[in-house]
Each structure stands twice: as C-alpha cells, then as structure tokens.
Amino acid sequence: MTTMSAPRIAGVATAGYGLAVALRPGVLLGPCGWSDDNTAGRAVARMAGMRDLASGLAMAVAARPNTMRLAIAIRVGSDLSDAVVLGRALRGRPQRAKAIAATVGWGLLCAATIAATRTG
C-alpha cells in the first residue's frame, strides 16, 4: 500500500455512501426507522449525502499530507456531529444505539487512517 492509500480508500467508500444517500435517501432514513415519504426528511438526508460525497472526494484526491489531514478532520467532525444529532433525534428508539455506533465507528476508522499521512 502506498502512502495515503488507507485514507483514500476510506474517502472513496465515504463518497460512495454519500452518493447512495443523495440518490436514495432511504439508505440513511430506513435504518433510522424513518420513512422516506417525508419531503423534509429526504432533503436533510440528501444534504448529508452530498456532504459525505464532498468530504469523501476530498480524502480521495488530497495531494499532500496536510491537505489529507484536513480532509480527514472534516470527515471525522462530520461523523461525530452526526452521532450527536442522530443520538438526540433517536432518543428512546431502538435504532439509536446502532446509529451512534455506525457514525462513531466510521469516524474512528477515518481518524485511524491519519497515521498514513505521517512522513519520516
């Protein structure tokens, strides 16, 4: 694996998921137990999908280690904010633990790839 391969792979995966959510909001809404019949819910899911697409692409194409670290930090911050927002929105619902685990887990996975950006 070449330098920065791990964050690039994580970036491509993130971008792919983001595109899937942007095109089909139910990919995000369904596991949360929300219907995708709601126009506002679909719009919010699409916004999150587009954000994930953009941040994933930033990780996939970052040319320098500092740029990659910034892209990773943005991705991790997005995942952690998703954990907070979904945790609050799903309070008292069975989907809450899974949503928090998925968002925090993905954030930690992306954070772990930062080691690949270290030189020397």
What does each of the following model-derived ranges do?
Residues 1-120:
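Short amphipathic, positively biased membrane-proximal segments
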